[in-house]
Amino acid sequence: MLVVALDTSTDMLACACAEWTATLDGGGVELLSHQDHMCRRHANVELVNAVDAALQDAGASMDKVGAVLVGRGPGSFTGVRIGISTAKGLARGAGVPLYGVSTLDASAWTAWRAGVRGLLGVAADAMRGEVYPALYSVDEDGPHRLFERERVVKAAVAVEEWSSRPDCDELQITGDGLVRYAKLFEEAGLMERVLDRELWWPSGEGLLLAAASSRVMLHDQSGDPAQVLPVYTRLSDAEENERKRLGLAQSAKSEVTGVADELAGRHLQFRPMGPADAEAAAELEATCFADASHTPWSPQQFMSELASDAAAPRSWWVAHDNGELVGIAGGMAIDTDVEILDVAVAPDRRRQGIARKLLSHVSYDVQMLGCTTASLEVEANNGTAIALYESLGFSRSGVRRGYYGTGADACIMTATLPLVLPVDATSPEPTAAASRPWPLPEPRRSDAERRLLEESSLVMAIESSCDETAVAIIDAAGRMLANQVSTQIDFHARFGGVVPEIASRKHVEVIVGVVDAALEEAAASLGLADPVAPGELAAVGVTQGPGLVGALVVGVAFAKGFAFAAGKPLIAVNHLEGHLYANLLTTPDLEPPFIFTLVSGGHTMLVHVRAWGDYEVLGETLDDAVGEAFDKVAKALGLGYPGGPIISRLAEDGDPKAIDFPRAMMHSHDYRFSLSGLKTAVVTYIEQEAAAGRTIHLPDLAASFEAAVFDVQFKKAWDALKQTGAKEYCLGGGVAANPHLRELLVRKLSRRGVRVTLPPQHACTDNAAMIAEVARRKYREGDYAGFDMDADPNMTL
């Protein structure tokens, strides 16, 4: 079987092709070609072309590949995601298995191939003064791990651990961590047996040898590309900081004076447990298990679970509503298994998906800490709980007699992580891929169905610029056959905004599942029984920018791998142009010239569209974007995230003239915007009312804030229409979904003889339908991108 191996977790782009032959002990590897080379910060530009070159050197092509192998890290966060996203795209586009292997193991096998034998230490660079340390015993059969799982430590700690070993004089060291921390190792006398510098990085052959030895291609992994995830050794900085903050918190409730009462009960929210939750958690436990054999936990037990010096890592989450704790779940990570310690949901809040959401968050945390399996005990007669766990992928593996007391047995259940959690807009949980046979069978098509697909010229588009993973499929006539979105709001809400690190992780986890859902939906729209296959598409479009760079690279890398493997052209799409084209979903006959206002979380701009592709940006915001201002005001009020929809709902019952907030730059005689002054005015008002002991009437504040923003938007738009002579006006961006802004613009501009086009509300926030419309037109014009395309976070119109 022909296998392509790749890794970009370090500055080395490792890429190789080999013939793999199954054997009883794992497999034999015959290296055919390699394209290993240093590519610092250019992996996303060079990787697909390196795969192409390696295949050509091997006298093969992608349609001959039987499997793809990828390094899962640990390593550079961005590098690992580029490699895994590209590999997922290659495997899904070609319909072949994808397998993952530790980059540390690949480095050890690279040393073995060079003749290294004995005690070997790999110190991979983890940045921030840290390394990923790994010790191996290397003999003629290969490297053997002397550690349970990957971890991250300060470089000085690794040096101390290794230099204090009684056999340290036998230790040979390698790894790209030596580039940054050589002095530390040298001062400890560990550089005397350092390997040659060219061996400090993993090679393509090392990946192949590591995979063969670990039997990953002999049923140790399913081969489903949706299931392959990076090796993470720590939570994101935002998550770590949040845990520290909660550890110091005195109360889990909102302390915003004057608004707490009005906020109570507006949202069911999920967040990590803090010490302030211990009493309520114990009370909830006692209520939930009042009639069970299980002994409820005490507040002291919960406090000990949250201690920073706990012997094993913990993850505890709570669900709260109306200032009341309504659910808890927690687990303890031991080696690569998480033991689920407790799950409890208030009796009147059951069957609402709360337990599933809580377990999804616990599962996600421990996956980031290296866990690959989960286990738990549940009362054998608790059929409801057992059914829930079975739906998540747990299976019964044993019984503990009398575990909860005489005659009260415990059913032992185990599961492989990630849990079976559906990927959809209402359940944005980690890696929603259910276990399934892979590769998928070839679709069965009649001649008429094949003609239909060929005539339809289906274009698939991928959007990943921020916190939505979206995929849409459009036909040649502009009919939207599929439109799938997986949102991450639950994972960012507790931080009051999008955390780029988490957004990037989530895209990697769900992108295959969202693509699968779109291919199935498109088939159903065409009346086909089997999902659309990658080879039945005409082209693949993807958002190139602007956006969060870590989020963009996932979509771009996946799309490039997918298009290359499927043999389809690649189309680069400007996200801002996508928001403009979203108006065509409502008004297909829309033609320039017209004025376009973009109002989103990242952009506020006024554009004169002279022709398709010919855009004059008349003015932009000098500081905060409109959506950003909404989020910041909502955060100041303790309303939660995202702020736009919450403020909009409050404003429905408010008086827009109740508070006279400033209209910044309304009479500046240009098309620039500024929102920071308005934001400051709102915060000042909140502080003044709090100091006076007055309760803030949130609907009035929300309506007055909206009016201050929207009055300026209308004034600038009308001035631009008069200056340019345009008779049509369009709106776009997440804030374009606001019903009050839509009504105001239609009412005021229509009476002035302007035709107003608004995108469908579902197409205002980030989605792939608008990207698909741009990609369809570019496909028709033959406007394709090369496989050296990279994400452009600063792209402009």
Regions found by a protein language model. Name each.
Residues 376-385, 402-407:
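Conserved beta-strand-loop-alpha-helix junction that forms the acyl-donor binding cleft
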Residues 246, 251-260, 531, 649-729, ...:
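A contiguous, well-structured pocket-lining segment that forms one wall/lid of small-molecule binding clefts
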Residues 25-26, 30-32, 36, 42, ...:
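Surface "functional belts" at beta-alpha junctions
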Residues 366-377, 400:
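Conserved GNAT acetyl-CoA-binding A-motif
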